[in-house]
A protein has these predicted regions:
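Sec-dependent bacterial lipoprotein signal peptides
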Residues: 1-20
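Exported/periplasmic ABC-transporter solute-binding proteins
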Residues: 22-71, 75-76, 80-81, 117, ...
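Pocket-flanking alpha-helical
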Residues: 76-107, 223-225
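Short alpha-helix boundary/capping motifs
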Residues: 87-89, 109-111, 232-234
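Acidic, polar ligand-binding/catalytic clefts
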Residues: 91-114, 242-252, 257-258
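Conserved catalytic core of two-component sensor histidine kinases, primarily the HATPase_c ATP-binding
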Residues: 120
């Protein structure tokens, strides 16, 4: 009887040990995150960092066991990270291209897209600039090099050459104007400059009377105004018109209301591109961004 009890005890001990060792094993990927817990890093276009920081703070406050760490980069490098499976989530201003989708599927992946928001591409100028309205047509003339001086757009202007400044040569802003406004052609203005980040674009325009900067509208709000209705006072936000001749009556600034009712003409879709086989925290954060709480 004692011998049988001994065998039973040893057997139960072995079963318990095996169960414990199996439960301690991590997945082959090394990830242990769930839909609402764990730690991940994800890539995001740098131009969306003000939005992402706000959303991240709310998400981590709501889900105490979750930590999401953004890697701010440009659109091209962020997409490469996703394709190389160095991240499972990318926040950017375009969807997958067909060849990118196929590349991921050919390797046994199941990439998905979620539309999370809409953003205005803002045109900013020096705060002393009295020429505050511009048509999409004239902006295209600046991009393609047809208009290189302020007087080409505003006859009589004495501001000289237009200094056109973007955040980054590989950014979503550059991709948007080339794809949506220039029909896939490159920017041809000889006076175009890349300032590396959106913050540097704002700083450059604030110090350069003849500049036009192109940035995401989420960078414009005055941090002192909790209603988000006051733009940064160091620069002027230009009103943009869909019509051939811009006037104060037919031109609009990139307030959220004018973006959502389609009055403002330069609108980008913000996407969450996901390639997460675990359906873990990348999915949880992406769905939070599109939810009413995230909006």
């Amino acid at each position: 009887m004692n011998k049988n009890l001994s065998y039973t005890f040893v057997g139960l001990t072995l079963v318990a040990a095996l169960w414990a060792s199996c439960s301690d094993k991590k997945p082959k990927s090394g990830r242990t995150d769930t839909y609402s817990s764990g730690v991940i890093s994800f890539a995001s276009d740098e131009s969306f960092s003000p939005i992402i920081e706000e959303e991240r703070e709310v998400f981590e406050f709501t889900y105490k066991k979750a930590k999401v760490n953004p890697i701010y980069t440009n659109e091209s490098d962020g997409m490469q990270m996703l394709l190389d499976k160095k991240t499972c989530l990318l926040i950017t201003a375009r969807d997958y291209k067909p060849e990118e989708l196929q590349s991921l599927k050919d390797r046994g992946n199941n990439p998905r897209t979620i539309i999370i928001a809409y953003d205005g591409l803002a045109l900013i100028s020096h705060k002393t600039n009295t020429d505050s309205c511009i048509s999409v047509k004239d902006f295209v003339r600046i991009l393609n090099g047809e208009a290189t001086k302020w007087s080409d757009i505003y006859p009589g202007s004495k501001r000289g050459e237009i200094a056109l400044v973007f955040d980054n040569q590989k950014s979503s802003a550059v991709h948007y104007v080339q794809d949506s406004l220039l029909g896939g052609k490159p920017i041809a203005n000889p006076n175009v400059t890349a300032a590396l980040t959106s913050a540097e674009v704002v700083n450059y325009v604030a110090k350069t009377p003849n500049a036009i900067g192109i940035i995401g509208s989420n960078w414009l709000n005055d941090k002192r105004d909790t209603t988000n209705l006051t733009f940064n006072k160091d620069i002027q936000v230009m009103s943009v018109s869909k019509l051939e001749k811009a006037t104060p009556l037919n031109s609009w600034k990139p307030y959220q209301y004018y973006i959502y009712n389609d009055n403002y003409p330069l609108i980008r879709t913000i996407y969450a591109l996901i390639n997460d086989p675990r359906n873990g925290l990348p999915w949880g954060f992406a769905h939070f961004l599109e939810s009413p709480v995230g909006q």
